[in-house]
């Protein structure tokens, strides 16, 4: 997911990045692919003492702690230092840095669409000579590797993954673990039958600061790919299917009629509730809702704090609408790219795609590995999710993250207006198509 902050905050963050870049080590001698690939826990590390790699990503708080734990073995073995800055203003910082050249060595990229923009601008460095691309491709979840390519060259690699559209619930209300609902109609029927004293069928929180609305876009995406299939889904985010198309309207209608209309507190509560706290009413007495839809990474953001996986909470995959697309999974991930090809930067990014590196974050929790060989999951739920990502029959990537920046921002904004009841479906789709008419031409 991508976020934007107001300009005064952004300027301060950009200033911090400038200082970080100035404080980094002087350009080091170029290193070949072997020095990067060997700099990991399981191989002989290159000697990079005194060198610094500047990195920015969206991770703060517990996620930042996990990332720092992930890079610690590399720092210990190479002698280099990772200077990390966590911010939700990735878009703004990189957009400001492209023209000036004031950029970090490595960065978590906002999404595949922005990665292509950075490549076109000549800012991102290709990774084909930095890591063994064949090995990376064979070890990475199918469907992700091509998202990091532009004109056949690899510019972005995934160091962490996520499954979106999981249905979270409390087994104390009803345990779905032995036979989760397979279809949407079955899900709605079972939620109603097992609702008990819960006040509503669904919990929903879509507030996320300047990025408010993105959790609602996930609802649309998960519904659409299962109703209309991956071809329509991919053509839609690419601007080839109009927002006013009947298939798109059907997904929006399902969201409004089946979800928002049956949400705890209604749409006005949903737009005011932080997404990480959206599922909190599951555990109230009486429960506020019977189910909550969110991605696998929600457990790493403080959701279900002090709750035990499998006992206090559980999850199952988003059910199907059309049996033809029953194996569809919406995935997401953290795409990393390199702006400065120093020896230390090349070594670090080659390390980050390995299973030993990704196992560190996986074991901490709240993350799925993009590497299929990582398996150190902390609980059965996380392990199942990891298998979903690695073995999906139909894997599509988060649609909004692949849209042009203006389109993505408008999608978020109109989902807030729609959910809160300030806008009708037809009005929202017409407005979004008007933006699409220009956004895809830039």
Which ranges hold each PLM region?
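Conserved N-terminal structural module of periplasmic/extracytoplasmic solute-binding proteins
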Residues: 22-116, 121, 133-136, 344, ...
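Hinge/lid segment of periplasmic solute-binding proteins
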Residues: 40-47, 112-165, 215
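Short, solvent-exposed loop/beta-turn-alpha elements that line the ligand-binding surface or hinge
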Residues: 47, 128-140, 179, 206-210, ...
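Conserved C-terminal helix/tail region of periplasmic/extracytoplasmic solute-binding proteins
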Residues: 52, 389-442
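Extracytoplasmic/periplasmic substrate-recognition and gating elements
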Residues: 72, 287, 304-367
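A structural signal for short loop-to-beta-strand junctions that line the ligand-binding cleft
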Residues: 96-97, 104-105, 136-171, 325-329, ...
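Extracytoplasmic/periplasmic solute-binding protein
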Residues: 155-159, 188-241
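Glycine-centered hinge/linker elements that transmit conformational signals in sensory
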Residues: 237-272
